[in-house]
Amino acid sequence: MSRETIVGREAGTSAALLCAACVAVAGCLGSGADDEPRVIEGDTATIYSSVPRHGVSASTAAEVVAGERRALEERGRRAGGLRIRFRRLPATDARDKAWDPALVAENAHRAADDPAAIAYLGELDYGATAVSLPITNDAGLLQVSPGDGLTSLTQRPPGRPRSGPERYYPTDRRTFVRIGPTDLDEADRLVARLTSADDTKFGLVFDREIYGRELAAQVVERARRAGLTAVASEEYRGQVADIPDIARALADEEPDAVVQLGVAGRGTIPMLVAIDDELPGVPLLASSGILALPQLALPAGPSRIEAFGPALPPEQAGYEAMRLVLDAVAEGGRNRRRVVAAALRLSRRLPEDRVALYRPDAHGRFAKVRR
């Protein structure tokens, strides 16, 4: 599969999926944030948290929520003269999904329709915010994501001029802050690693979800600018039986390195083992999706893999997300628009470099490499 195929058909398909989600959401939106209540009445405000209860991100979600609760308890459950009520909402009910679009939309609508809502924490990862953000933005509600890296939420992805963030903001006002890195940040680090190792030809394997497809397009575009070439790209569609053919197709192009882009699942270890069998010793790189399963233990062969992911551990990311919201409420009080303005200003305190390097430890489990 050529570079043009990734950037064109694959990325175009993911864009279509995102647009379809946004169109479906748009049909449920009201007439805009100006029609919504702007000021919290009474002495209690609600912060909603949308996270998976099942699936690959469930354990990460539990840590994120623990961090959110810790930050809230440290403030005595109060901010801006308000008592803060915390509501956790499930973003998935299926064990084989990272997130469920219908549930994410339902969560966002519940928060947007609540006159006592002051902020929405979500989504956790892998592009789910593309569904919830238009809804919360239409209500003028602050949304803070602990970990969703979808680049187009805040900037135009390279090579995709029609995929900018404006489609997520029906009010034409930004109401979103993210705590972790963008997928483009990860793409830049992956390409920098390839460049530093003089791996001018590389292969890609990515999953069929929005996360993998969009990230693949960004890696290819950034690599092209750096003078590198994607000599092979293979889409993994969740069928373990297809893995040997994918590994052989990658090996046929004799890449200097292979980059794995996708969310960890039952095919992750078989895929890495198959690639190692076909390309023994060839450098392996991965994005943060491979970190989704903390219990993942790699065998000796592919344990040379390096991954780039969020610098903050999940519990700390949840803590920082809630802390930012509470600080914004302390400044903005009962007024949603003032809370949003405060959060956008306070987000400048977040570190610019939010990406860390991960390598498998002696047990084959990924651990952050200390600088």
Question: Where do the language-model regions lie?
Answer:
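Beta-alpha junction/loop-to-helix N-cap segments that form part of ligand/metal-binding clefts
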Residues: 35, 59-63, 78-162, 236-241, ...
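Bacterial signal peptide processing site
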Residues: 29-32
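Extracytoplasmic "Venus flytrap"
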Residues: 36-69, 79, 89-99, 208, ...
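Segments of small-molecule ligand-sensing domains
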Residues: 315-370
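C-terminal motif of bacterial Sec signal peptides marking the signal peptidase cleavage site
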Residues: 25-27
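Bacterial N-terminal signal peptides that target proteins for export
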Residues: 2-18
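Extracellular/periplasmic periplasmic-binding protein-like sensory domains
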Residues: 268-320, 330-333, 365-368
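Extracytoplasmic ligand/sensor domains, especially the bilobed periplasmic-binding protein
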Residues: 117-232, 282-306
